[in-house]
Amino acid sequence: MLSKDLLEALNDQMNHEYFAAHAYMAMAAYCDDASYEGFANFYIQQAKEERFHGKKIYDYINDRGEHAEFKSIPAPKTEFKSILETFKDGLAQEQDVTRRFYNLSEIAQKDKDYATISFLNWFLDEQVEEESTFETHIDYLNRIGDDCNTLYLYEKELAARSFDEE
């Protein structure tokens, strides 16, 4: 049985994962509108990954005999000035998610809920990868600058990205 605080935090995080999926779809829409289909694909795959994370938390809550509680998801930001801005926003979002998982881990440790600590370790490892991915893209976009040919090639590389549930 999960403590009240831990269940509430897990439900909040599950809902936040679905919000993150919406935010990435808004970034995909911006990219599609700007005719950057490769970048749009990157964000569509990110959204799939966030929905997978939400479902993983949903399953865990249910496996622990508790009730997953869905809440209203606020509308994400939909206006961006550049592709680089979408990646900076994505990094900030992932950093926020990392902080949220640290908080969840602290609650689980306080509760001595070792099963949840083990469950959350997967997400903590995942967040290292997520932040690194966004930092790499930001660095690369900064290096590309206004070089349209290199940006075109980079975008084509991202068009091939796909998400497979682990």
Swiss-Prot record:
Domain Ferritin-like diiron: 2-145
Keywords: Cytoplasm, Iron, Iron storage, Metal-binding, Oxidoreductase
Recorded catalytic activity of this chain's protein: 4 Fe(2+) + O2 + 6 H2O = 4 iron(III) oxide-hydroxide + 12 H(+)
SUPFAM superfamilies recorded: Ferritin-like
Residues holding Fe cation 2: E50, E94, Q127
Enzyme class: oxidoreductase
Family: Belongs to the ferritin family. Prokaryotic subfamily.
Protein name: Bacterial non-heme ferritin
Gene that this polypeptide is encoded by: ftnA
